[in-house]
Every structure is written in C-alpha cells, then in structure tokens.
C-alpha cells in the first residue's frame, strides 16, 4: 500500500511538470461531511446515526483539462471521517454502549471529470487515505464513560481506500458521495486484556459532503 502512495505522488509530480503552467491549475477549499455507516455486529445489523463533521476537512486539487468537456485531477486532502453507533456490545463485559468512532485521514485522490469545465461537470475517482489520528468515545445512559485516542492506531485499518462520485457546480460549490471499500476497524486488533473488541464488528463508512472550492490558484474561485 505504501508503494501505491509513493507511485501516486510521483505520478502526480511528473504529470504536473509535464505540462506548461497554463495547462494546469489548482483549486482549494473545505468540505462539510455528513457520514453514515453500514454496520453489523455478530451478524446483526446495528443502528447508526448521522455524523456531522464540518471540521477539519481541507483539500487541494491539481487539475488538467484536456478540453472543455474532459479532464483529470489529483491532489491531497485532510478529513475527519467516522460514524456513531447505538447498541455496541462490548465483548469484555457483554454490556451494551453507544459508540462514536472517528479518524483524521490524509488522502490522495485521482479521478476524471466530464461536462463543461467552466460551468458544471461530473466526476468520479479513487482515493487512498492514511488514518493518522484515531478517536473512540463510549457512552452509557448519555454520559461519556471512556475515551481512546491514538496516533496511527492499530485499532483501525490505517490504510483505507474509497470510491467517489460527485458534481461540481458554478461558484465553487461541490456535492460528493464517497464509499469506503476498506472496513473502518482492524478486526484482528487485540487489547491489553487479550480481547478483540472489533472481531465481530463489520463497518463500512460512506458519506455525502458539501464543499466549496474557495480558491482557483491564488484567486477567489468564481466562474463568470
């Protein structure tokens, strides 16, 4: 997986240097994420709630438009991804809790664009992400009873891949759907008590997002 990341970065660098400055442009801005998850534990579907994450979600894209109707893009992004779950059964005490899981990820996307590059276009692509900060909160009867935080935690699958599709609207507005192909948790993780808290937990995160590309190169992003 690390080889894939390095290859993607090198490919992006070579593609950028291969075009003149006028052929390539950048866009940057923020993303507001509304995430869900398809979750099951011990084979039974679990109840999950909408997770609203307005921060910290930043992204910068490098674009190459081959015509006014087709282009490619790549870039780098930092985002806050996760889900909320009711009825998590803790294998250590067989009690049921409410859980909130999240991860701060840095990602490298690669994709294509079809439509009118100066107005409205549709896009799709693939993204590889590295989860660098994991957080987990446990609630009982509405009160927080535990919190876990870890850098590059083995509780989650640190390397995550996803597919995305969306539409770019005028004035920098953007609507996107993303589905994570990689399970959120590392099922093989074993804690200090010898228990695997996620062994029976299957979780696939997906989200809708609303983002605004605030800048095109160094100027305010507005189509005339």
Residue ranges of model-derived segments:
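Bacterial N-terminal signal peptides
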Residues: 6-15
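Boundary at the C-terminal end of the N-terminal hydrophobic targeting segment
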Residues: 18-20, 83
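Short glycine/proline- and aromatic-enriched beta-strand/turn motifs that initiate or cap beta-hairpins
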Residues: 20-63, 211-224
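Residues on the lipid-exposed face of transmembrane beta-strands in outer-membrane beta-barrel proteins
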Residues: 32-34, 54-64, 76-78, 106-116, ...
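Flexible, solvent-exposed loop segments that connect beta-strands
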Residues: 40-48, 83-101, 136-155, 187-199, ...
């Amino acid at each position: 997986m690390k080889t894939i990341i390095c290859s993607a970065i090198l490919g992006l660098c070579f593609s950028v240097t291969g075009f003149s400055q006028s052929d390539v442009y950048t866009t940057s801005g923020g993303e507001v994420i509304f995430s869900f998850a398809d979750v099951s534990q011990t084979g039974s579907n679990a109840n999950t709630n909408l997770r609203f994450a307005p921060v910290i979600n930043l992204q910068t894209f490098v674009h190459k438009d081959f015509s006014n109707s087709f282009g490619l893009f790549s870039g780098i992004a930092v985002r806050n991804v996760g889900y909320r779950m009711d009825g998590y059964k803790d294998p250590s005490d067989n009690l049921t809790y409410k859980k909130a899981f999240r991860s701060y990820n840095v990602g490298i996307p690669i994709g294509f664009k079809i439509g009118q590059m100066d107005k409205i276009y549709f896009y799709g692509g693939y993204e590889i992400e590295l989860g660098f900060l994991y957080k987990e909160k446990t609630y009982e009867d509405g009160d927080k009873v535990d919190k876990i935080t870890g850098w590059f935690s083995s509780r989650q699958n640190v390397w995550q891949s996803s597919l995305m599709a969306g539409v770019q609207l005028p004035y920098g507005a953007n609507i996107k759907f993303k589905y994570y192909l990689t399970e959120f948790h590392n099922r093989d993780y074993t804690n200090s008590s010898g228990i695997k808290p996620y062994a029976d937990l299957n979780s696939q995160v997906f989200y809708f997002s609303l983002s605004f590309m605030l800048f095109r190169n160094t100027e305010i992003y507005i189509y005339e």
